[in-house]
């Protein structure tokens, strides 16, 4: 939303004594591509329902067609997401399959005014390729919360239309408290031979076994 409405640019200009107003786009009028439809990706789909009826394209290595009963989504391959989406948001784990999944080839397939978001894991988007593509003027914005190496001091800091945050996705007191409670409760269930609630599906675990 910040990138769609140039909020970060307006904020900087206001602090510099400038009064400029920017045309943006409404979320309900664009196409959103979601790569990775696990718990978080599904949550993104759910949250988007409050913004009208954007077209939602989704892709996952293990499609969950049951979601079609609750949401108006379209399952497509990744290439179609890169080519059609106005916003591409990544919600996959970092695996051998997703390492450098988004390279220059994929970025240049995106619309010139598209936006890409990565709040999943560093290393999924090739940072050097993203820098070079954005430096050339392609893409209207990027929002990156995770990096190959953290703390991040790389070249993307030079790109003003690239919003960078310091891996802050779970950085709220209530979220961290909930994480600690859930981890403790799951450990207790394991140690007392009770059914577990956070089991990784075997098919996903098989992918993780392949390593990076």
Question: What role is predicted for each listed range?
Answer:
Residues 62-155, 171:
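Rossmann-like adenosine-cofactor binding region
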Residues 1-31, 43-46, 51, 196-201:
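Phosphate-binding beta-alpha-beta segment of Rossmann-like dinucleotide-binding domains, i.e.
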Residues 150-212:
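C-terminal helix-to-coil terminal segments
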Residues 4, 57-59, 64-66:
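Structural/interface elements that position substrates and couple domains in central-metabolism enzymes
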Residues 50-55, 136, 140:
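Conserved S-adenosyl-L-methionine
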Residues 52, 71, 158-160:
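Short, structured coil segments at secondary-structure junctions
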Residues 37-38:
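Glycine-rich Rossmann-fold phosphate-binding loop(s) that bind the pyrophosphate
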Residues 28-31, 53, 104, 113:
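Phosphate-coordination loops involved in phosphoryl transfer and adenosine-cofactor binding
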């Amino acid at each position: 939303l910040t990138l769609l409405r140039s909020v970060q640019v307006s904020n900087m200009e206001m602090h510099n004594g400038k009064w400029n107003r920017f045309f943006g786009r409404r979320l309900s009028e664009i196409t959103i591509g979601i790569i990775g439809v696990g718990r978080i990706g599904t949550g993104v789909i759910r949250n988007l329902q409050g913004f009208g009826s954007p077209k939602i394209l989704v892709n996952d290595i293990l499609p969950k067609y049951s979601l079609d009963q609750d949401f108006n989504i379209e399952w497509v391959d990744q290439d179609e997401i890169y080519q059609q989406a106005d916003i591409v948001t990544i919600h996959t784990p970092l695996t051998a399959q997703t390492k450098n999944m988004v390279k220059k080839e994929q970025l240049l397939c995106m619309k010139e005014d598209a936006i890409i978001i990565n709040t999943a894991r560093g290393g999924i988007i090739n940072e050097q390729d993203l820098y070079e593509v954005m430096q050339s003027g392609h893409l209207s914005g990027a929002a990156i919360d995770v990096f190959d190496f953290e703390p991040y001091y790389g070249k993307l800091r030079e790109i003003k239309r690239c919003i960078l945050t310091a891996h802050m996705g779970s950085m709220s007191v209530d979220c961290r408290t909930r994480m600690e409670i859930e981890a403790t409760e799951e450990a207790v269930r394991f140690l007392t031979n009770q059914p577990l609630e956070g089991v990784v599906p075997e098919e996903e675990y098989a992918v993780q076994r392949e390593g990076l």
